[in-house]
Amino acid sequence: MSTEPKPSPLTVADEARADELLGRLRDDLVAADFTVAALESLWGEDAAAALHRGERVPARRVLDARRREHGASAGLATLAELFVLGVAVPRGELSEALARLGVDGAIELGLVGDAGAAEGAGDGGDSGVATSVRARLDLRPYAFSDAYGSAEWWIISDLGELALGHALGEQHVLGVGGASMTLSGLMLPTPARRVLDLGTGCGIPAMHASRFADRIVATDISERALEIARLNLVLNGIDGVELRLGSLFEPVAGERFDRIVSNPPFVITPRIEGVPEYDYRDGGMVGDALVEAVIREAHDHLEPGGIAQLLGNWEYREGAGGDADGLERVGDWAAALEHWVIEREVQHVTEYAETWIRDGGTKPGTAEFDRLYDAWLDDFAARGVERVGFGYVLLRRADAAASARSTAVAAGAGRLARLERLHGPLGANEAGLGAHLAECLAEHDRQAGLDDTALAAARFTTAGDVTEERHYWPGDDDPTAMLLRQGGGFGRAISLDTGLAALVGASDGELSVGAIVAALAQLLEVDETALAAELLPAVRTLVDDGMLRFAD
């Protein structure tokens, strides 16, 4: 177990008092213009980029120069020094920056603590009298765009490695991270009556779900995480979220939801003494068993037609089918549900171990890093694991409409069951992938309910982000390769032959697929039935991928 000190306690026991203080804090943050854009303007693009890499020196130098020039920091700079850079600031300057909350209010909330006499930048007073304060929690702005527009929140979490100066504690509550932003971007923006956020952490998934859901139940195994999640909900004025303590689906036994979203603690961690068990990423199971458990149990907690979206890892084991092993295992776990699993990355076990040891704040080149590295590799070797996949999982419980789709065409043909490896760069998705996923699901359901005769009668248009590429050898009139490229979504590139290229090019919403196929058969001097048998499945695929859309 970790020997790091426990995180600072959250000191406000009375919720009404905490709500009052958080309201004052909100007013102060607005007054200081404590926003992403203002911070980047304060210290510049280079320093902002360095902060994203975990380096604060460039930003600190900018603020140090400002202090030398002006003698004291303005409100925005004070908050930036304190909460973003993790350095102590004079109590008097923080009092000005938090005029409504006050320093005592910030201490009562657990945001800051007394850093001791004369620690941090001086305020011009006697060194024996001057006092400074230091952040006890991380607080920073978070800006995003989704299908409903752009918005900005403030996110409270535990201090990160940069501010702590040492490895994280096991009870650490993570703030905005790559995984939480990925999941938030994947969420379907379609309205939902009741949503479950499984493993909410500091509350970011639940907050995003509030953009499209009437009611949300957010659970976590960490009581501290739920306390911080409540702070974030109140600070940002978000209602309709119920917080429950417990592991996985235990807090919602017997309940069903229209939507489940989850960034579960899926990181594969050795189950041996001395390896830190971080609440925010370690579910306490062996290997990828936690992801399997979430996928298998989701069925019982989804309403008919309900959808679950989660992130996860899966193991590739030697002698178990090579590339078919990891992703196919996920397909087996999801067999009771319609599913769309997209693998985005595969790491060798050495890369995986390095990533997550470093994530906890243990520095490479130290004896502790090497000890943990051995533990990870021993654990993988014991199960014959060679690589680890990471990706997105979308699950859907069948409803009456799904049954109708299955009976409208060949048995099972209308069922969503996709396992994909899409390891390349994504397309441009300013509002996240969620809107693209929602469109693909809707179009899939529509085409899956049509037999080939009905599909041939349908009219399509090419999606607005799709372009065609043709490659030529110098001097040749005929292309050597043709590609259909998706600008948004997953940035797919589909190889085209002459027939499919011509069909896509003619799909302007005026002619049916059948009419286009008939004209092409005459032009290419081929059998119309054979050409239709070749092109209609390709049309279904392009519809599923979001590259062709129904014209009406």
Task: Give the positions of each predicted feature.
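Acidic, low-complexity/disordered tracts enriched in E/D and polar residues
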Residues: 2-78, 133-140, 163, 400-505, ...
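Long, charge-rich, low-complexity alpha-helical segments
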Residues: 75-120, 126-137, 184, 196, ...
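SAM-dependent Rossmann-like transferase core, predominantly class I methyltransferases
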Residues: 116-119, 127-195, 200-202, 208
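Conserved SAM/SAH cofactor-binding pocket of Class I
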Residues: 169, 177-262, 268
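Conserved Class I SAM-dependent methyltransferase catalytic core
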Residues: 221-222, 287-343
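Short "lid" loop at the C-terminus of a central beta-strand within the Rossmann-like core
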Residues: 250, 267, 284, 313-318, ...
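Mobile active-site "lid"/loop adjacent to the S-adenosyl-L-methionine
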Residues: 262-293
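Flexible, glycine-/basic-rich loop-and-beta segments that form/coincide
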Residues: 349-441
